[in-house]
């Protein structure tokens, strides 16, 4: 059985669809804070859905004790909101991740953990390499770095964990909220309006298609690689 935390979210739901199409037995854990059941409409009859939070240790333990692997996508992800809800972001993104790592140590399953390019902060050089310094500049990014440090700590105790640092992911079912710039651009173009660009237009961002993010997750889970972080962009 494969567990996908945050499996009703943008990226998680695409991972779930791939796993179901491959024939895997899939359980989704999502509290539907930002995830939506409609994201799972194509596969809802083929997954076991649990409405819950990764901060609920006993609930997690009951799910993962017989698991072959966990795709850990659940997180609070809004940078602006993270300034206002720092305790909540720490509880979910850090404590919730540690719950999964503790259980991975006890039960021996593999974890593919979603991280973020935001851990690098404002990079001094492009392209960014995995070995570059991590210098997060907002509370959200700080929680992702703390989660990475926990993963590194647990990997020293033979927990099989791979971290994927997503850059700006776009694709079907993407929210129009913060950072969904491609979706916003396309909507304005469809309305015969010019894309709205903030600032001087010289800023750059690295984008990655959601299906490519799915491929990265599957390769990470199926590989024999252990205890590494990879950029996905």
List the model feature ranges, each with a label.
Residues 59, 81, 173-177, 205:
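Secondary-structure boundary/capping motif
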Residues 87, 186, 205:
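Short alpha-helical segment that forms part of, or immediately flanks, the ligand-binding pocket
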Residues 32, 201-204:
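Short donor-sugar binding/catalytic loops of nucleotide-sugar-dependent glycosyltransferases
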Residues 145, 160, 169-184, 193, ...:
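Glycine/proline-rich active-site loop of Rossmann-fold NAD(P)-dependent oxidoreductases
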Residues 57, 79, 194, 203-204:
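Conserved catalytic core of two-component sensor histidine kinases, primarily the HATPase_c ATP-binding
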Residues 1-169, 189, 211, 224:
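N-terminal Rossmann-like NAD(P)+-binding domain of SDR-like oxidoreductases, especially those catalyzing
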């Amino acid at each position: 059985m494969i567990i996908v935390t945050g499996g009703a979210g943008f990226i998680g739901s695409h991972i779930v669809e791939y796993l179901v199409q491959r024939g895997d037995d899939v359980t989704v854990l999502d509290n539907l804070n930002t995830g939506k059941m409609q994201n799972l409409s194509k596969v809802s009859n083929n997954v076991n859905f649990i409405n819950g939070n990764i901060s609920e240790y006993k609930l997690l333990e009951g799910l993962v004790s017989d698991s072959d692997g966990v795709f850990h996508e659940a997180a609070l992800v809004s940078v602006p909101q993270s300034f206002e809800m720092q305790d909540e972001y720490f509880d979910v993104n850090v404590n919730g991740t540690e719950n999964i790592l503790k259980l991975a140590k006890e039960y021996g399953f593999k974890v593919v953990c979603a991280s973020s390019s935001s851990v690098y902060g404002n990079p001094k050089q492009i392209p960014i390499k995995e070995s570059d310094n991590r210098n997060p500049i907002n509370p959200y990014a700080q929680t992702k770095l703390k989660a990475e440090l926990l993963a590194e700590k647990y990997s020293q105790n033979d927990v099989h964990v791979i971290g994927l640092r997503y850059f700006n992911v776009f694709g079907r079912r993407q929210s129009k909220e913060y950072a969904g710039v491609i979706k916003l651009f396309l909507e304005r173009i469809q309305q015969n309006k010019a894309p709205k660009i903030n600032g001087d237009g010289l800023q750059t961002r690295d984008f990655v298609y959601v299906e490519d993010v799915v491929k990265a997750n599957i390769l990470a889970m199926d590989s024999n690689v252990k205890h590494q972080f990879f950029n996905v962009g």
